[in-house]
């Protein structure tokens, strides 16, 4: 019999808690990640007040130096620890796939200087359209259409850009490049990015409408992803007939594999929390697993190195955490974690190789304290242990520690 009827996993995208032991093997603008510390540096430089996460035990997580403005609790309401990544990457897909039990020994490719000319020219030759070279770099999805949408409307050129993750995105005005044509071009781009030196996790069609100065991305986005190379714990749950709910970009990250209820993309963290609470309230969701990604920390503030915005975003989540807890049932387990770091005080604009925090709370807990420091995949091993399914490639359950 399951210890918990439902487990809700919430990933605070990029909220790392200090450099991992191998952080110096990863770099940002030529600077090794060894001094990165997302939560620590935010707390130290701009202050961090997250009393609800602190109550569960955020300030109790072992660190070389305590979080400056997040005190340890004498008697926390839950359990806490930090987890180390073993996979050879620090991107979103690698982090999430490892959380669900995979060891990624061949990381996806990212393109901080834009895609190589041979990929761009292949897409041009296939599509019969030129590509705007100035857009070919990591770019905000809204900024790139503001900057190059007017030119696309005049010339019909393609807007191709990337991000910190292993993705190639093509933005196209629906009145200039019809959806079916955009999708066909994306399918071709997918076909030429399936192996090194350009092994990409996703190709994303990003259609938009409107006039210069008032462009709006539409709901006709389409992702061309790759599925995990082996079954994850999501697949094990699905195969056992256990409900799996995805909130935010989780469905995209796993290409729908192992997910039987996709609750849609988030417009913002707040919208994602609304969707999670709605999901938790579904009468038919009696037993199973929900998996939520809240990306604003990373997308809006980490990459932009905006410490104040990142702090405020953490405050907003913490203020809404009681609503999530109120939506829990007696035999629910809430797990709050991250997928990598993105220290807004650090060099460069890329993710940082860090430990991730783990907070565990249930109304049924009679104990509290620290869980031994482990690895990302311990989360999925615990989920598997609870529901009586097999683990994936890696991971050790800490279910026995939650009492």
Swiss-Prot record:
Cofactor: Mn(2+)
Chain positions recorded as Mn(2+) 2 binding sites: 298, 303, 351
Pathway note: Carbohydrate degradation; 2-deoxy-D-ribose 1-phosphate degradation; D-glyceraldehyde 3-phosphate and acetaldehyde from 2-deoxy-alpha-D-ribose 1-phosphate: step 1/2
Location of the protein in the cell: Cytoplasm
Protein name, entry field: Phosphopentomutase 1
Keywords: Cytoplasm, Isomerase, Manganese, Metal-binding
Main function: Isomerase that catalyzes the conversion of deoxy-ribose 1-phosphate (dRib-1-P) and ribose 1-phosphate (Rib-1-P) to deoxy-ribose 5-phosphate (dRib-5-P) and ribose 5-phosphate (Rib-5-P), respectively.
GO molecular function: magnesium ion binding; manganese ion binding; phosphopentomutase activity
Matches recorded under HAMAP family: Phosphopentomut
Pfam families: Metalloenzyme (PF01676)
Signal sequence coordinates: none
Binding site for Mn(2+) 1: 13, 339-340
Catalytic activity from the UniProt record: 2-deoxy-alpha-D-ribose 1-phosphate = 2-deoxy-D-ribose 5-phosphate; alpha-D-ribose 1-phosphate = D-ribose 5-phosphate
A Gene Ontology cellular-component term: cytosol
Disulfide bonds: none
Gene that specifies this protein: deoB1
GO biological process: 2-deoxyribose 1-phosphate catabolic process; 5-phosphoribose 1-diphosphate biosynthetic process; metabolic compound salvage; nucleotide metabolic process
Cofactor notes: Binds 2 manganese ions.
PANTHER family reported in the protein's UniProt record: PHOSPHOPENTOMUTASE (PTHR21110:SF0)
Record-stated family: Belongs to the phosphopentomutase family.
EC number in record: 5.4.2.7
InterPro entries named in the record: Alkaline_phosphatase_core_sf (IPR017850), DeoB (IPR010045), Metalloenzyme (IPR006124), Phosphopentomutase_DeoB_cap_sf (IPR024052)
